[in-house]
């Protein structure tokens, strides 16, 4: 049976956790894009910027479900640094992997159990998008490591 209010549910907390994570990812990817551009990786810079915009859209979709007020959450987020473009791609792929294999499937399952099927579907779909982001980053990592990026 579908619920009408998120207030006091784990799904409400999960949405805020995911919103914060997507918002941070957007900023990290923007920072990583600047570093890639500085290192001469124009195409990778554009991919980071494109992905940052997609993360913004994910954050927007999640934020629209929230009902306002104050909510206390406990979550861990990467307190990483801006490294080389290769290091940044590796960090990004790691984060996307965590989201698509653990966080979003778990959050979708909880939303479904709590009676929020529409939210569960959105969470599942964002997880699919994160899987694509991970595969894209891993392909770029391979191309840099194999010296085939510009070939």
State each model region's role.
Residues 1-151:
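Non-heme di-metal
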């Amino acid at each position: 049976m579908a619920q009408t209010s998120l207030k006091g549910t784990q799904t409400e907390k999960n949405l805020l956790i995911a919103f914060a994570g997507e918002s941070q990812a957007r900023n990290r990817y923007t920072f990583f894009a600047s570093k890639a551009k500085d290192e001469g990786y124009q195409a990778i810079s554009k991919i980071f910027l494109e992905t940052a915009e997609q993360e913004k859209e994910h954050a927007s979709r999640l934020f629209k479900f929230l009902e306002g007020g104050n909510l206390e959450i406990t979550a861990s987020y990467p307190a990483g640094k801006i490294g080389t473009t290769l290091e940044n791609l590796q960090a990004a792929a790691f984060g996307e992997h965590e989201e698509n294999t653990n966080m979003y499937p778990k959050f979708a399952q909880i939303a479904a159990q709590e009676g929020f099927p529409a939210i569960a579907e959105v969470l599942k779909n964002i997880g699919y998008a994160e899987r694509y982001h991970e595969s894209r980053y891993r392909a770029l990592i391979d191309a840099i490591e194999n010296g085939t990026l510009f070939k």
